[in-house]
Each structure stands twice: as C-alpha cells, then as structure tokens.
Amino acid sequence: MPPKGTPPSFESELPGRPGANWAALLLPPMAALSIGAAAIHFAVTAEHFTEFWLFGVFFAAIAWFQALWPLAYLRWPTRITAGIALAANLGTVLLWAWTRFVGIPLGPSVGDAEVVGVADLAASGFETLLCGILLLLVVPAVRSRLLATPVSRSAWIGSGFWVVVVVAITTWVLALHGNDIMVMGH
C-alpha cells in the first residue's frame, strides 16, 4: 500500500483485496463501455460507407479499435495503453459533437449538421464515461483526489458495476431495435 497522501498507482493493491489492483478492477466497466460503443459503430459502418467512403473507413477503424482495445489493455495495463484509448475516444466524442453542432468537416455533406440519434448518443455517452475512467488511470492527480478515501473507492467500485449493467442493457436494446428508437435520426 502506498504511503498516506500518495495517489494509488496502477499496481497499487486494493485495501483488503490482495493481488487485486486498480487497473484490473476498472477493466470490466472499461471493456463494457468500449465494446458497447464498438457494437454501435459496427452496426452503422455499412450505412456510413454509402454516404462517403471515408466515413465508412473511420467507423470501421474506430469500431475495431474499441472492440480490440480491452484485449490490448488486458495484456498491457499501462498508462500508455490507457492514454491511447483516452485520445481515441475523446477524439471521437469531440468529432461527434462537432458534426452535430458545427457541421460535417468534409465529404459530400460538408457543413451540414448531423441530427442526434439515440444510437449515436449512446455511443458517445459510452465513450465519455470511458474517458472519465481512463482519466483516473492516466492522470495521477485525478486518481488521488477521487480515490482518496475508502468511501470514494467503494463508490467507484459500485459505479463500475452499474456501468457494466447499463451498457449491457442499452447495447442489447439498440441491437434489437436499432433505428426504430431514433429520437431524431436518419
């Protein structure tokens, strides 16, 4: 256990759980969020290829990245691996926001703002939550502040459980109903 006041590291054992560390504990909710976003991106890749080939390439690439990233993190649970995922997912969320509020930056519909649909909102929500967890792993100051007490650590553990449950249910519903539940979709 690190000295008092030292932020828990990736390798820090969890109090009362010998052999368990923060990196391993946070993998299930991170994997659920990443795979949930990947499933949504896989589902819309073909549609985006018909709009513009580069859109399809982007959706295929981010879907594969999000599907495979948890395996890479399982093998290499480092700040670098977490940082790469943080950059990719944060970039995707920012691009999503840009295309909704400013307009599509390139392609045949350049300048047109996309409508917000339930599926893309869910994927962006998953990515945003994933970025929050990744921030814990990448930035020690965030980790030390948010995991400073046993109560806050327990809250994060409980939140992680509910993230997995909500992502699983949302992904399942979207897989079953897809475009039928679009709020404002195309």
Language-model segments: residues:
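Membrane-interface extramembranous regions
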Residues: 2-186
